[in-house]
């Protein structure tokens, strides 16, 4: 459907994406209606899908989707886990309606139930797994688009896109390619610039694998914290260490400091000086204390003899 236009031709980076995701790898069985899309068969029995015809059918499907005026009238369905995330991303990017998970029988035919829908276009991931919506679409004349492998039945399928619909990377890449072409044909994004959305967002991830990756990352982080190589004590930066002064703000009472001799030598020298000084002489002095008169006036001034016991005041000073 490229019509020979260079702008619609498959680019080299698109081919590399197809090869990296394994989109060209079919199954070991071949349906007679899918034989026209097979390039050749490998020695191990796996059929190789012609990527040129895959690209042509991809453009045809994108044109059919763009022809629907209301994007919500396009219904995308995937009952397999590998395509549910891709369907949700496709629906959020293009505005389509999605049924991720189990398809309720009678959604297209039973008008009584609350989940009744009347889409104008149906897109499925696997014709064999999504046979129920394909059968109901045939009852109400809804055109259908399907991602078909080499062994997929083409009954009730109007536009078959040959690709590997088993691998999670291949399914995610095909939905990403389809969403990109739809947005390009609508004029939402430009063909001259690459789309900022990566195909990895459309890939299915097993919850067990995600949990294992998180556990491995946590164990790696714990092991890195425990092993620090040769241990060495950290060098304290004394120059920048600030010691707080706890005496700040504490009122200390002012008590006079008593001066004492410096040591034993000072005390000994003071005693020797006192011993060397002459004391009061008692030679020729024989006072009889009993001969004192009984009527001594104690209020009178003291005699000069009373001050000779300790020497003069100048001698002690």
UniProtKB/Swiss-Prot annotation:
The modification N-acetylserine is found at residue 2. It is found in: Cell membrane; Cytoplasm; Nucleus. Residues 278-317 are annotated as: Disordered. InterPro entries: Ribosomal_uS2, Ribosomal_uS2_C, Ribosomal_uS2_CS, Ribosomal_uS2_euk, Ribosomal_uS2_euk/arc, Ribosomal_uS2_flav_dom_sf, Ribosomal_uS2_vert. [DE]-W-[ST] repeats lie at residues 230-232, 245-247, 288-290, 297-299, 315-317. GO terms for biological process: ribosomal small subunit assembly; translation. Acylated. Acylation may be a prerequisite for conversion of the monomeric 37 kDa laminin receptor precursor (37LRP) to the mature dimeric 67 kDa laminin receptor (67LR), and may provide a mechanism for membrane association. GO terms for molecular function: laminin binding; laminin receptor activity; structural constituent of ribosome. Coiled coil: none annotated. Residues 161-180, 205-229, 242-317 are annotated as: Laminin-binding. Gene3D superfamilies: Glucose-6-phosphate isomerase like protein, domain 1. Keywords: Acetylation, Cell membrane, Cytoplasm, Membrane, Nucleus, Receptor, Repeat, Ribonucleoprotein, Ribosomal protein. NCBIfam families: uS2_euk_arch (TIGR01012). Belongs to the universal ribosomal protein uS2 family. This is Small ribosomal subunit protein uS2. It comes from Ictalurus punctatus (Channel catfish).
């Amino acid at each position: 459907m490229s019509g020979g236009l260079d702008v619609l031709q498959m680019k080299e980076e698109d081919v590399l994406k197809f090869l990296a995701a394994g989109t060209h790898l079919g199954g070991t069985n071949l349906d007679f209606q899918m034989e026209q899309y097979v390039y050749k068969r490998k020695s191990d029995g796996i059929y190789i899908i012609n990527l040129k015809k895959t690209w042509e059918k991809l453009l045809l499907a994108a044109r059919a989707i763009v022809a629907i005026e209301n994007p919500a009238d396009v219904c995308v369905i995937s009952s397999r886990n590998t395509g549910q995330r891709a369907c949700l991303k496709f629906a959020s990017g293009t505005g389509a309606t999605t049924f991720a998970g189990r398809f309720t029988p009678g959604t297209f035919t039973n008008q009584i139930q609350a989940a009744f829908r009347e889409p104008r276009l149906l897109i499925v991931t696997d014709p064999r797994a999504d046979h129920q919506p394909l059968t109901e679409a045939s009852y109400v004349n809804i055109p259908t688009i399907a991602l078909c492998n080499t062994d997929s039945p083409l009954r009730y399928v109007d536009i078959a896109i040959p690709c590997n619909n088993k691998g999670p990377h291949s399914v995610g890449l095909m939905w990403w390619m389809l969403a990109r072409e739809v947005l390009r044909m609508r004029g939402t994004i430009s063909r001259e610039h690459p789309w900022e959305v990566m195909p990895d967002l459309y890939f299915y991830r097993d919850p067990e694998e995600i949990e294992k990756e998180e556990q491995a990352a946590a164990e790696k982080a714990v092991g890195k914290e425990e092993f620090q190589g040769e241990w060495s004590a950290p060098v304290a930066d004394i120059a920048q260490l600030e010691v707080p002064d706890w005496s700040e703000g504490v009122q200390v009472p002012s008590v006079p400091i008593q001066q004492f001799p410096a040591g034993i030598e000072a005390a000994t020298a003071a005693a020797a000086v006192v011993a060397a000084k002459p004391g009061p002489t008692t030679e020729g002095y024989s006072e009889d204390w009993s001969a004192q008169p009984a009527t001594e006036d104690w209020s009178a001034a003291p005699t000069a003899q009373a001050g000779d016991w300790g020497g003069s005041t100048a001698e002690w000073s």
